[in-house]
Amino acid sequence: MADVRYYGTGRRKHAAARVFLVAGDGKVTVNGRDISEYFGYETLIMTAKEPLVLTETEGKYDIMVTVKGGGFTGQAGAIRHGISRALLQADPDFRGTLKAKGFLTRDARMKERKKYGLKAARRAPQFSKR
């Protein structure tokens, strides 16, 4: 009998993550590499694994992630969102816990566009009185 796979899609900024959960011993693979090898920074790894720590399921699932787009911070946030959604599929009782922390909500904040006449989104050129 094949193992049951749980799936979740996560997004943050310009990053999109496809997350698969399978019963296992807690291995997290991101784009074919170990999570610590992929990110390198402990803070990003902690961000991505937050839903597992919160629901106390850290050693219960093997996680395979494919993530594209954005930078490392956006990708870590997308993985967190995807893992949360997949955990919800695995056990609907986690909804209250995950929702209270805001892990099920897509973070809609995006980079503000640059406007013409300005140097950046809001940065104006230096003003000279004379």
Swiss-Prot record:
User: What is the top-level taxon of the source organism?
Assistant: Bacteria
Q: Which PROSITE patterns match?
A: RIBOSOMAL_S9
Pfam family membership, one: Ribosomal_S9
Q: What is the annotated signal peptide range for this record? A: none
Q: Name one GO cellular component term.
A: cytosolic small ribosomal subunit
Q: Which InterPro entries match?
A: Ribosomal_Su5_D2-typ_SF (IPR020568), Ribosomal_uS9 (IPR000754), Ribosomal_uS9_bac/plastid (IPR023035), Ribosomal_uS9_CS (IPR020574), Ribsml_uS5_D2-typ_fold_subgr (IPR014721)
Task: Please name the PANTHER family in this protein's record.
Answer: RIBOSOMAL PROTEIN S9, SMALL RIBOSOMAL SUBUNIT PROTEIN US9M
Which family, according to the similarity comment? Belongs to the universal ribosomal protein uS9 family.
Name of protein: Small ribosomal subunit protein uS9
Source organism: Exiguobacterium sibiricum (strain DSM 17290 / CCUG 55495 / CIP 109462 / JCM 13490 / 255-15)
Its taxonomic path starts at:
Bacteria, Bacillati, Bacillota, Bacilli, Bacillales
The protein's gene is named: rpsI
